[in-house]
Amino acid sequence: MDIKLINIGFGNIVSGNRVISIVSPESAPIKRIISEARDRAQLIDATYGRRTRAVIVTDSGHVVLSAIQPETVAHRFMSNKDTKDSDK
C-alpha cells in the first residue's frame, strides 16, 4: 500500500489514503461537523488564520480545515493518484 500525501496549503499535508470527503464549509451540517470535532478535540485548523474554504473529513474522525478551495484539493488528490498509477 502506497502512502499518498496531499498538500492542503501553507506546507500542510494530509494522508490521501485517510480522506473520506472534501467539502465546502458553507452548509449547516458541515458547520455542525466542525463544531462537534472541536468539542471532541479532533479538529485540525490548517488555515493559518485565513478563511476556511475546504473541510477535509478523515476515516479516523478528524476534521481538517484548509484555506484552499475544495476543487483545488481534489485536483491535487487526483493528480497525485494519476502520478502513482503511471509509476506502476
Swiss-Prot record:
* Superkingdom as given in the UniProt entry: Bacteria
Pfam families, per this entry? RemA-like
List the InterPro entries.
Answer: RemA-like
Similarity comment: family membership = Belongs to the RemA family.
PANTHER family, per database record: REGULATORY PROTEIN SSL2874-RELATED, REGULATORY PROTEIN TM_1690-RELATED
* Protein name from the UniProt record: Putative regulatory protein AM1_5498
Q: Which organism is it from?
A: Acaryochloris marina (strain MBIC 11017)
